[in-house]
Amino acid sequence: MKRILHLTLLIALGAACHVIHDGVPGSGKLQKEKRNLGPFTSISTEGAFDIAVVCQKPQDLEIEGDDNILPLVSTEVSNNVLHIKNLRNYSTSSPVALKISVPDLMGIYSSGAGKLEVSGVKNDKFEIDINGAPTIRVSGETKALSVDAKGAAKIDTHKLRAARVEVDSKGVSTVEVYAAEQLDVTVSGPSHVIYRGDAVVNKTVNGPGSVEKKESEGS
């Protein structure tokens, strides 16, 4: 088990450093640009970015990074999904940053590393599917939350108030959620799930992982 854990962490660290030590060198001259996109309701990322999303009108995207690196970052919408990925490897002292406004966000899908923070969610359903070692934070309100975490992800959604929550956590991931009514959770490997709220809990733990209740803030 220790060998598997060590290998998982090495893979995660490799993903996190992928754009830092290899590829086209950044110029060091920071530049911002606006990008016009079609409508989308989900975001998919591949790589290590620093992304801040606010659920509000109007839709907007601003990207900041070294001026010679920005053309290497693709932001395209397909089937209502905004895909953010690198067209080539590059080397920079800090990750490319994106600020995004979108009227309604229903899901985030990420592979690789980086940070992604979402605020202002208010809808009936929200989905998170992560593979790699990103740090994810989400806040707001939703009726149903689904979280699928693999690798060494760190996902904090305890400020996303949800009635019903489903969590499937694998690898060395850490997931925090808030569930008011029902929580169905499956843990595999040394992953860790922390929940708040008074939900009825159905849990399956395979291996040394754990499911832990934490008192809600202010209680």
Located regions from the model:
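Short secondary-structure boundary segments
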Residues: 4, 20, 144-146
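Sec-dependent signal peptide recognition
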Residues: 2-10
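Extended, compositionally simple hydrophobic/Ser/Thr-rich segments
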Residues: 33, 40-53, 90, 95-100, ...
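C-terminal motif of bacterial Sec signal peptides marking the signal peptidase cleavage site
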Residues: 13-16
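Short linear S-[DN]-x-LW-Φ motif typified by the pepsin-like aspartic protease active-site region
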Residues: 18-89, 95-101, 193-197
